[in-house]
Amino acid sequence: MAELNTHVNVKEKIYAVRSVVPNKSNNEIVLVLQQFDFNVDKAVQAFVDGSAIQVLKEWSMTGKKKNNKRKRSKSKQHQGNKDAKDKGERPEVGPLQPQAPLVQNGHMNGCEKDSSSPDSAREKLALTPREKKISILEEPPRAQRGITEGSRLLQQKMSLDGNPKAIHGPSERSDGLQWSAGQPCNPSKPKAKTSPVKSNAPAAHLEIKPDELAKKRGPNIEKSVKDLQRCTVSLTRYRVMIKEEVDSSVKKIKAAFAELHNCIIDKEVSLMAEMDKVKEEAMDILTARQKKAEELKRLTDLASQMAEMQLAELRAEIKHFVSERKYDEELGKAARFSCDIEQLKAQILICGEITHPKNNYSSRTPCSSLLPLLNTHAVASGKQGNFSRKSSGHNKPNEGKAANPKMVSGLPSTADACQQTMPTNKQQNGPSNQRRRFNPQYHNRLNGPAKSQGSGNEADPMVKSNNRHEHRRQPHNGFRPKNKGGAKNQEAPLGTKAPEAPPHSEKARRRQHAADNLETRPFRGNVGRVSQCNLCPTRIEVSTEATVLSVPAVTLVA
């Protein structure tokens, strides 16, 4: 019962791992659990981190797992003791059989049937690497069979709850396990029983195959891809560095010129203050000279009272004062600002320096065998871009095509609108003429039904409507259209007559064309509609009030 509880615990651990990783098969979960000594947390962490893929690769590729030798030896010793007990109970399973690599209890390359003692396990571990390589090269199908049998063995462990025959004690279960472990080693046994399990094992093997093929196909290109990725990431970093350098340089430029500006302002302030001082000093000197001149002038006024010696002294003073007038002129020019602006501008222009980037990159011409691939990729990307543009641009012609029938179908409605607009304008402009004179068409309309009997009775409604339209198309004296020539040329084929025609001629024309109007009515209506559409743009500005006001005019005439 203890071993049964162990299997139940294994199944519960499988379910616990599957609840976290639902897209993994039972075989993969069991192999990873065996790798981590059925520790659920470590197995789940391995699936999450992706290290479970490497574990599964080690299970699928025989002879590659080199660690855990101590663990293997201990498990083999334990299995050897267990097999010795089984041999004592069932001696018929005793003969040795050829070994095949089998996945069992977390280690590889061992058939537990032969390991009757710990010495045999140690002998197996003492194989040289060369012998291991030879065994791997000579027996690849056996390795696959070992993986298949290992997965089948694990499935048997999981199905212990549903199989009542398996619960009879540890001896029978161990015999069943030994039989399943010994089956791939015996070539004479039939392989039909292992067919249901073989369908799952190659699938797991095929999942690992593309990665191995990719590694075998281009081990060097992976290093190049990593180098390219590092270089690409560094380009992004350098781009950020350029932006940072530009920002810092801009700040430095602003700071430098702000300092220059402050220096210039300070110099300007100092020069202005100095100029004020110069002005004040010059004014003081001139004021003193002015006082001296005033004093000499006052002395000259007193010259009549002076002695000869005093007059001589006064003349000498005046002569000295006058002789210094050249200094007065220099004093007037003393308040002058001078600056070598050109030299300063040249110094400012050469102030500051910016280093430009140097394009030291060299272009390498690709090999002739690589050019077709590059051209094909470029053409494919170009076609894809053009296809996306065309697909986005195909909607516009369809919209245009869809809009054309609407425009075509809108022509009759426009013609009808024009036809309705023209009579409205004529009725709006011509009620005064209709009230002033006798209109023979309305007179004939009132007397027509009594005179036309027999065959004329069928055509009377058409004739009335035709006369009504003809009267609406008839120009009046009060309305002068802008295109007189066009109106005359277009209304002449319609058979419209001037209102001065006598009544009997209008009656004769109506009787003559009464029968023809039944057949020619659609054609004439269309012609009239087109002709009115040609005149429509000049009369398109019609308000709703004009349409309402035109109705009483027709009613009054009728």
UniProtKB/Swiss-Prot annotation:
Region (Disordered): 63-148, 161-202, 383-514
GO CC entries: cytoplasm; nucleolus
Keyword Coiled coil: yes
Subcellular location: Cytoplasm; Nucleus, Nucleolus
Residue positions, PTM N-acetylalanine: 2
Coiled coil: 279-344
Modified residues (Phosphoserine): 120, 455
Main location: cytoplasm
Keywords: Acetylation, Coiled coil, Cytoplasm, Nucleus, Phosphoprotein
Record field: compositional bias (Polar residues): 416-433
Pfam families the UniProt entry points to: SPATS2-like (PF07139)
Top-level taxonomic group: Eukaryota
Biased composition (Basic residues): 63-79, 469-485
InterPro entries membership: SPATS2-like (IPR009816), UBA-like_sf (IPR009060)
Basic and acidic residues compositional bias, start-end: 80-92, 110-142
PANTHER family: SPATS2-LIKE PROTEIN, SPERMATOGENESIS-ASSOCIATED SERINE-RICH PROTEIN 2-RELATED
Family: Belongs to the SPATS2 family.
Protein name: SPATS2-like protein
Lineage, broadest ranks: Eukaryota, Metazoa, Chordata, Craniata, Vertebrata
